[in-house]
Amino acid sequence: NIQPWKVYVASGALKDRIRDQMVAKVMQGVPFNSDYDYPETFDGEYRKRQVACAVELYGNMGIERGDKEGRARAHLRNFQMFDAPHVVFIGMDQAFGASVAIDVGMYMQTLMLSMTAHGVGCCPQGTMRYYPDIVREAFAIDGHINILLGISFGFEDPAVPANQTWIDREPIDKLVTF
């Protein structure tokens, strides 16, 4: 395999600078400018799963459905990297498409499984791709590298209500055809 992933790890002052710049953009209402399109909405079974995830997560955080301020604070926590001490950004060359992104996805899954096996908590975050220019500037990344996502990581705090969230998975017979 061609190992198409590009990996950038930020800790300390660098992570804080990236976090602060992202939070500032969110607070200023700067539109997201992801390198890749993401669906505005989901329909059918995907929407059902999205809503179930939100209900579970926000429920654990004590945020009611109509609490727009609470939801906004929870959304902002993404850009604050959930106070994790480190974040890894994953990118790939813009010339590559979905078939190569599959390799990158396998790398990301292996990275997260390895972190977990070593007692390190991690949270994959699509929101870390919303302001890719901040990441490119921080690491002096060429413009042809697109940022796919970030993974905040560190030792998990079990007292944080969001960390108690468990999202049910569909039964295998609903996802796999035999």
PLM regions with names:
Residues 1-178:
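Acidic, surface-exposed loops and disordered segments
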